[in-house]
C-alpha cells in the first residue's frame, strides 16, 4: 500500500516544471465512470440503507360461476442493502515545486483524481476488482453465474442480439451497453441482413454512440478487463449507486502522513509541503427483482455479458 507517493522533480514529473520553451500541458479529458453515468443513483442519509425489491408476485384466478369463491394472492419484497464505503487519496506536493511550476498544478491534479475514482468504482462494480466486501456482487460475475453469457464470434451483431434475447427471457429490457475501449470501431461496419447499420456513432464527435438504438459507453478509464468481456448489456436501472458524499477536496498545509505501521513518511510543516485530500463516500448494489418470466433468482439477472473470444475456460 503506497503511503509515500509524492509529486516531485523526478523525470516523470519534470514536464510540470517547464522550460521557457514550452509552458503548456496538453492532456486528454478525464475518462468518466460508466457506473456514475448509467446506474440508478440514490442519495443516502446514512451509512446503511435498504432498498425494497419485488420478490414475490401476486397471482390472479378466474372465479367459477356466479357464486364462486375468489382466491387470495400475495406480494412480497426483499431488501437490497446499500453500505457506504469511503474512497480517498492524499496527494502531497513540495511547496518549492509548486512555486517553480508555471502551470496551476492543482488544476491538473484534480481532474485526474476524479478519473482515478471513476476507475476504482467501475472496476469494483463491473468486475469485482478491489470491491469492498460490504458491496453487492459485481455485474460480470453475477451475469455469468446466471447463465446470461454469449461468447463473441464472427458475427457480433448476432451475438449482441442473442444476448438481448437472454435478458428478455428473464423479463428484463436492455436499455444500454458498456464495452471495452475500441469496440465502437469494430461495430461501425456491421450491418443487418437488410443493410442497416446496427451501431451509430455520435455525429457531434462526443464519446459513445448507439447500438441497436441503445446508448453504448466505452469504458476508457482503465477499469475494463478485456480478457473477460467485450460488452455488458442490461437494464441499468437495476444497478444502484448510493451517494452519501460527492468528491470533496481539502487542502492541508500542516500535518503528517503515516504508513500502515504508523511511521511518519511526510511531515508537511517540517518538509515544506502541502497536500490535497480527496474523499468520496459511495455504495453499490444490484437489484434482481422477480419477473413473470423467471421466478428463480439463481438463473435471473438484469445484465448479460458478451464474453471475449479469447476467454479461457477454467
Task: Specify the residue positions occupied by each region the protein language model found.
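A residue-level signal for conserved active-site and pocket-lining positions in enzyme catalytic cores
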Residues: 51, 113, 276
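Protruding loop/beta-arch "assembly-hinge" segments enriched in small, turn-prone residues
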Residues: 1-23, 31-34, 64, 267-314
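Extracytoplasmic/secreted cell-surface and envelope-processing proteins
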Residues: 101, 186-189, 286
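Alpha-helical scaffold segments that mediate packing/assembly in large oligomeric complexes
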Residues: 71, 77-81, 86-170, 299-300, ...
Amino acid at each position: 500500500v503506497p503511503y509515500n507517493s509524492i509529486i516531485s522533480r523526478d523525470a516523470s514529473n519534470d514536464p510540470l516544471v517547464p522550460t521557457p520553451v514550452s509552458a503548456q500541458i496538453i492532456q486528454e479529458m478525464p475518462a468518466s465512470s460508466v457506473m456514475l453515468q448509467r446506474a440508478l443513483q440514490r442519495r443516502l442519509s446514512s451509512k446503511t440503507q435498504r432498498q425494497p425489491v419485488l420478490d414475490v408476485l401476486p397471482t390472479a384466478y378466474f372465479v367459477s360461476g356466479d357464486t364462486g369463491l375468489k382466491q387470495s394472492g400475495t406480494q412480497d419484497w426483499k431488501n437490497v442493502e446499500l453500505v457506504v464505503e469511503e474512497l480517498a487519496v492524499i496527494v502531497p506536493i513540495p511547496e518549492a515545486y509548486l512555486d517553480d511550476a508555471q502551470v496551476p498544478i492543482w488544476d491538473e491534479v484534480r481532474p485526474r483524481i476524479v478519473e482515478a475514482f471513476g476507475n476504482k468504482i467501475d472496476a469494483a462494480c463491473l468486475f469485482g476488482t478491489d470491491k469492498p466486501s460490504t458491496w453487492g456482487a459485481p455485474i460480470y460475475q453475477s451475469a455469468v453465474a446466471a447463465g446470461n453469457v454469449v461468447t463473441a464470434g464472427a458475427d457480433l451483431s448476432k451475438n449482441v442480439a442473442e444476448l438481448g434475447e437472454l435478458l428478455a427471457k428473464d423479463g428484463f429490457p436492455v436499455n444500454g451497453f458498456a464495452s471495452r475501449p475500441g469496440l465502437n470501431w469494430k461495430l461501425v461496419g456491421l450491418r443487418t441482413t437488410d443493410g442497416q447499420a446496427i451501431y451509430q456513432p455520435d455525429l457531434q464527435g462526443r464519446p459513445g454512440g448507439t447500438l441497436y438504438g441503445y446508448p453504448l459507453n466505452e469504458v476508457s478509464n482503465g477499469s475494463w478487463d478485456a480478457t473477460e468481456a467485450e460488452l455488458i448489456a442490461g437494464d441499468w436501472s437495476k444497478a444502484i449507486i448510493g451517494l452519501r458524499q460527492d468528491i470533496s477536496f481539502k487542502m492541508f498545509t500542516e500535518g503528517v502522513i503515516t504508513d500502515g505501521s504508523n511511521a511518519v513518511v511526510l511531515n508537511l510543516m517540517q518538509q515544506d509541503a502541502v497536500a490535497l485530500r480527496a474523499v468520496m463516500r459511495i455504495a453499490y448494489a444490484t437489484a434482481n427483482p422477480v419477473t413473470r418470466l423467471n421466478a428463480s433468482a439463481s438463473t435471473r439477472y438484469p445484465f448479460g455479458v458478451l464474453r471475449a473470444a479469447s476467454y479461457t475456460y477454467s
